[in-house]
Amino acid sequence: MVQRLTYRRRHSYATKSNQHRVVKTPGGKLVYQTTKKRASGPKCPVTGKRIQGIPHLRPTEYKRSRLSRNRRTVNRAYGGVLSGGAVRERIIRAFLVEEQKIVKKVLKIQKTKEKQAAKN
């Protein structure tokens, strides 16, 4: 006859957060073993892609004691938060904005010089 199994925790519904597997103990008994949810890993908030170089863990396992800093991040600006493509885009955009400011400034100076020349 098949051995009946009962959950070992109070949560009694077969939901995604209460997944179990049947394991045979050395004593020959069948028991439920709670399985952990599969981790999807960190995503870039801009592109939505997975951030490469960071292990896929559950959110609590990224804490200081469980994972060292060099495993939690990537060695660049916004490392471990934004993907490489998003960082590259931000750098280029910032550079172009600064260039535009300089161009505006130069045009303004040229205009004032032309006005001065027209007056004289």
UniProtKB/Swiss-Prot annotation:
One of its GO terms (cellular component) is ribonucleoprotein complex. Keywords: Ribonucleoprotein, Ribosomal protein. It comes from the Eukaryota. One of its GO terms (molecular function) is structural constituent of ribosome. The keyword Lipid biosynthesis does not apply. InterPro entries: Ribosomal_eL34 (IPR008195), Ribosomal_eL34_C_sf (IPR038562), Ribosomal_eL34_CS (IPR018065). PROSITE patterns: RIBOSOMAL_L34E. Coiled coil: none annotated. GO terms for biological process: translation. It holds the Pfam family Ribosomal_L34e. Disulfide bonds: none annotated. Belongs to the eukaryotic ribosomal protein eL34 family. This is Large ribosomal subunit protein eL34. It comes from Pisum sativum (Garden pea).
